[in-house]
A protein has these predicted regions:
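Alpha-helix termini
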Residues: 44-49, 118, 153-155
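Conserved small/polar residues in nucleotide/adenosyl-binding loops
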Residues: 211-217
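Pocket-forming structural segment of enzyme catalytic cores
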Residues: 120-208
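Hydrophobic/aromatic beta-strand patches that form the interior of the parallel beta-sheet core
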Residues: 21, 54, 70, 103, ...
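Short low-complexity stretches enriched in small and charged residues
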Residues: 21-31, 60-63, 116-124, 159-169
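Cysteine-nucleophile active-site neighborhood
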Residues: 76-153, 160
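N-terminal beta1-alpha1 cap of cysteine-dependent amidohydrolase-like domains
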Residues: 1-98, 133-135, 213
């Protein structure tokens, strides 16, 4: 894996290196979610692209120059630390505003929102990239998840096939007026808002509910 040294910002192409920014894998990878960056790198390489993973830890500033970002989940304390770090080092905000995609898995979703409820019942401040809030469910949701893509309003409907994966979460996420759904749950629990709940996505911030694995179809 690459370090932050000599990081540049190429136009992605097969003759340039695509930099995958793995956000805070030192504290936000409780379930091995940093493996998403590994899978993404491998899939790019198999298609003839050069790709490197940039590990961005709590000791690093957050660069705005990566081509794509990934983030996993963690416990309450880790989420609070990560949220503060991303609010302080605002490279991710710059990158997202420039249209760089971000894949947030597990608790990475609730952390990107306005606030999320922690174990003692208090509200922890989120990063503020998504207009969502998260509270605990009565019971944990575990099992297969299938979602139907919602492409209305997207400049390029890049999703045409169902999203399939595995969900494992306690959180129930409510979308605010500025959050747009990526898909509607066909099978499974999803956000555990009423039946047919939505998976939020704003622009190219792909916060795929709490799905740990999204399967290509």
């Amino acid at each position: 894996m690459s370090s932050l040294h000599n990081l540049h910002n190429p136009t992605p192409g097969k003759d340039s290196v695509i930099h995958i920014g793995a956000l805070l894998p030192d504290i936000m990878s409780t379930y091995g979610d940093d493996g998403n960056a590994l899978v993404l790198r491998e899939r790019l390489r198999r298609r003839g692209y050069q790709a490197e993973i940039i590990r961005i830890t709590l000791q690093d500033d957050v660069p705005s120059s990566c081509d794509i970002y990934t983030m996993g989940g963690g416990e309450d304390v880790a989420q609070i630390l990560a949220s503060k770090h991303l609010r302080t080092h605002r490279g991710l905000f710059t990158a997202v505003e420039a249209g760089r995609p971000l894949l947030a898995i597990c608790a990475g979703l609730q952390m990107l929102g306005e606030w999320f409820q922690v174990a003692d019942g208090s509200h922890a401040e989120g990063v503020g990239l998504l207009d969502v809030t998260t509270v605990p469910q009565a019971t944990r949701s575990i099992g297969e998840l299938v979602g139907t893509p919602l492409t209305e309003g997207l400049a390029e409907p890049f999703l045409t096939e169902p999203l399939m994966g595995f969900e494992n979460h306690m959180g129930a996420t409510v979308l605010g007026p500025d959050a747009r759904p990526l898909s509607r749950v066909k099978y499974g629990v999803g956000n555990s808002i009423p039946a047919g709940s939505s998976i939020p996505a704003t622009g190219l911030v792909d916060a795929v509910s709490y799905t740990h694995l999204t399967l290509p179809t």
